[in-house]
Curated annotation (Swiss-Prot):
The keyword Zinc-finger applies. InterPro entries: DNA_Rcmb_RecR (IPR000093), Rcmb_RecR (IPR023627), Rcmb_RecR_Znf (IPR015967), TOPRIM_dom (IPR006171), TOPRIM_RecR (IPR034137). The gene is recR. NCBIfam families: recR. SMART domains: TOPRIM. A zinc finger (C4-type) spans 60-75. This is Recombination protein RecR.
Length: 201
């Protein structure tokens, strides 16, 4: 059994940090030590910011985004084309698409993908909210931007089937060769998807 070398408060900090995605036990220890060394400049402001976020952050009742207002900043932005909705798995995907800056449209966060093996069904996701948004009218296109996994494909098909008959165009992201990618380094699935999604030049 390993000897304890720190007090319970530091151990608790390490254990909580280890629960953050991307941080394992070793990275959590490093992060904790860094925070402790920078108590005044970093730990105090971080604790304050986390407290404020805990008190103020809400889940948008319209799209599922996280913000301090409900409806969120994206849903209330009149400069966005609200007739187009990009459907994503998680808020991190919404943020990634916003960083790309390709389109100024609305979003809908599902909160995951259908996965019967993991016990995740349609009622566990924000799919009904999407169907309700479309049924209200004013939406002309749904862009499904879920990951190219089995669960993502299943979710995309489920959504497409349930939007049929609502008079909305349903598209999905093209999958294929990344910008700057070399064909020799791509897997067969990516190459096949790129060939199917080919475009005129």
């Amino acid at each position: 059994m390993a000897k304890r070398v720190t007090g319970p408060e530091i151990e608790k900090l390490i254990q909580l940090l280890a629960k953050v995605p991307g941080l394992g036990p070793r990275s959590a220890r490093r992060a904790a030590l860094h925070l402790i060394k920078k108590r005044e400049q970093l730990m105090g402001p971080l604790a304050l910011a986390m407290g404020e976020a805990h008190a103020k952050v809400k889940i948008c009742s319209c799209c599922g985004n996280v913000d301090t207002i409900d409806p969120c900043t994206v849903c209330t932005d009149e400069r966005r084309d609200q007739s187009m909705i990009i459907v994503v798995e998680d808020v991190s995907d919404l943020w990634a698409l916003e960083r790309a800056g390709a389109m100024n449209v609305a979003y809908h966060v599902l909160g995951g993908t259908l996965s019967p093996l993991d016990g995740v069904g349609p009622d566990d996701l924000n799919i009904k909210g999407l169907i309700d948004r479309v049924a209200k009218g004013g939406v002309r296109e749904i862009i499904i931007a879920v990951n190219a996994t089995v669960e993502g494909q299943t979710t995309a098909h489920y959504i497409t089937d349930h939007l049929a008959g609502l008079g909305v165009k349903t598209t999905r992201l093209a999958h294929g060769v990344p910008v700057g990618g070399e064909l020799d380094y791509l897997d067969e699935g990516t190459l096949s998807a790129a060939l199917r999604a080919r475009t005129l030049i």
